Amino acid sequence: MRAQASLACLMLAACGAEPIGSSATNQTEAASISTDVGTTADAPTTDAPTDGSGDASATADAPTSAPASTGEPATTDATTSEPTTGDPTGEPTPGAFCEPVPACDAPPPTLPGQEPESSGYSRGRDMFYVDGEPQWVLGKFTKWGFPADKDIVGGTVHVFLDRDCAGEWVELGTTVTTDDGDHPIVEGVEDSGGRVYFEIPADQALALGRHRVYMIEDSEWESAELLIDVVPAGAPFFISDVDGTLTTSENEEAWDFLNDTLPDANPFAAEALSLLASKGYRPGYITARPEWLDRRTREFLATRGFPRGIMHTTLIYEGAMGDSAALYKSGEFAQLRQKGLVPAWVFGNKDSDALAFDNAMIDPPDHRVFFQYTDATYGGRRIDSYEELLAEFELLPDLCDP
């Protein structure tokens, strides 16, 4: 059990904050990241120890893409991955986020005799899949809450699907949570124990669109949910950081977690991103927060009015900051590029974001938007208020109705 006195320090690191009273390190000195999918290997991928010893083993330098038999993306040519921005035929842009957008809010399924969760920190991993590639349901199940977050090993997990978010749950099957290293890496997710790797059967493959998955572990009654967006290569989307970019400060989540409240959002941020979504850009969020903040991150986005989309935290207990955050985010962008997916717009607030966006080759540079941060090295665009973007985004072409 970690000492309670260390919680505030852990939370500050978890949310990517620099130590209070210190200045941020210069992330522009970090090494550039290749756009190959394996680049996430440089970031640590271990979870909190599960044996109570307090000694979590490092797993850096492990490959981070699954072998072909376990979900290697079908599209590997980065030269074909530029985002589509319009269709001269007058048809909607392939993969655009068009109405009607499903609410994906049907009441979750239950099992006979199911009891309330005792922990509430188990989590699913949202995914973008390109049509035709293997589709995996990924998650992690833990017990005992924070700060223990102990892996559930050998638990039976029931996997339910709400196809097209139509409100009808169907059980796809069951799987068993792993122990450390049991399963090969899939979609960059290394097996740190308590993991779910469930490949959707070919005859149940998800069509283009948005789908919701809900999982229930039947011994601790922990649950987890996730979204899957199936899109064509080149689908238009945006990616935003969270802490300091959408929240009102880099440190806010740390203190709000301890006080059991949610951070405030920067004024007009939700309106700006909602405008992009209304123009057909699929929402996405990549944060260097620790994985156990998955649910709070989703709650923040929903409560503060941000458009719902694919959301990724790190895969580690401590989260990442500085160079580690840049490496993590660069690896996430590399995996997307390998699928043929490159964001049309990105939003950040730190030098680690600037480095990751440059490694991801996001073009044009003025689509790299930084909130109250000047990207002097790579030429991204500074804004001091999201209100500056509203008129511009209002005038963007509608990818659903060109």
What do the predicted segments below correspond to?
Residues 91-231:
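Beta-strand-enriched, solvent-exposed domains that form extended recognition/catalytic surfaces
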Residues 267-277:
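Histidine-anchored nucleotide/phosphate-binding helix
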